[in-house]
A protein has these predicted regions:
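Conserved alpha-helix/loop element of class I SAM-dependent methyltransferases that forms part
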Residues: 1-16, 31
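Class I SAM-dependent methyltransferase SAM/SAH-binding core
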Residues: 17-75
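Short beta->alpha hinge that forms the Motif I/post-I loop of the SAM-binding pocket
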Residues: 45, 97, 120
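A short acidic, Gly/Pro-enriched loop at the edge of an enzyme's catalytic core
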Residues: 74-86
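A short SAM/SAH-binding and catalytic strip from SAM-dependent methyltransferases
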Residues: 84-97
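A short glycine-rich, Lys/Arg-flanked "PGG" loop and its adjoining helix->strand segment in the class I
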Residues: 99-111
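C-terminal alpha-helical "lid/dimerization" subdomain adjacent to the S-adenosyl-L-methionine
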Residues: 118, 122-173, 177, 183
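Core SAM-dependent methyltransferase catalytic element
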Residues: 175-199
Length: 199
């Protein structure tokens, strides 16, 4: 649902070139490929993720629409003012230097281009936040152990979400980078947030 929302936001701006940063297994990139006359570029620092992503893209015959390569969000291998839209789904939490990553995103976007970020966040309302923290600290690790081959990933999700910047802090960082018209959309009672900002 959120991936479709990202695509709908992107579609409003009639993009010709979109970069999906931290593309993972290309779920967002594949969704974005439904936009007509638009080329999708996906990068991820993980060679394993890119390999899986390429297999998925190939199996859906989307090679003509989507280009995938290994790449670092904090050192993008693209020229200035190249993309109309830049998307990042559950990726900025893993940036080593968020400021540097946002500056790189800003650099490769065309003037009046948009950045669309989807990221986990802590709910703002105290009551919901307490319930969320109890759930994430107790149940997420249990779910990870019971249903996943990689329970450490679930534990990391919980810990990294708690340590990550607040929604207000991310907005400030976007503004400090130079982005304007910053909008936030709260999802799952604040457990995830979509950020939309214009260069």
């Amino acid at each position: 649902k959120w991936k479709k929302e990202i695509t709908e936001i992107a579609k409003l701006n009639n993009p010709k070139k979109i970069l999906d940063v931290a593309t993972g297994t290309a779920d967002i990139a594949i969704n974005l490929s439904s936009i007509k006359n638009c080329r999708i570029y996906g990068i991820d620092i993980s060679e394993r993720m890119i390999k899986i992503a390429k297999q998925k893209v190939e199996s859906q015959n989307l090679n003509k629409n989507i280009s995938l390569e290994i790449g670092d969000a904090e050192n993008l291998n693209f020229s200035n003012n190249f993309f109309d839209i830049l998307t990042i789904g559950f990726g900025i939490r893993n940036f080593i230097d968020l400021d540097k990553g946002l500056k790189e995103s800003y650099r490769v976007l065309k003037k009046s281009g948009y950045i669309i970020i989807l990221e986990t966040s802590l709910p703002k309302k105290k009551f919901i936040k307490v319930i969320y923290l109890i759930f994430s600290r107790i149940f997420i690790p249990i779910i990870g152990k019971l249903f996943s081959n990689n329970p450490k990933a679930y534990k990391y999700l919980q810990e990294s979400t708690e340590k990550f910047y607040s929604v207000n802090d991310v907005v400030k960082k976007l503004s400090h980078t130079g982005f304007r018209e910053i909008e936030t959309r709260s999802k799952l009672l604040g457990a995830s947030t979509i950020y939309v900002a214009k260069k």
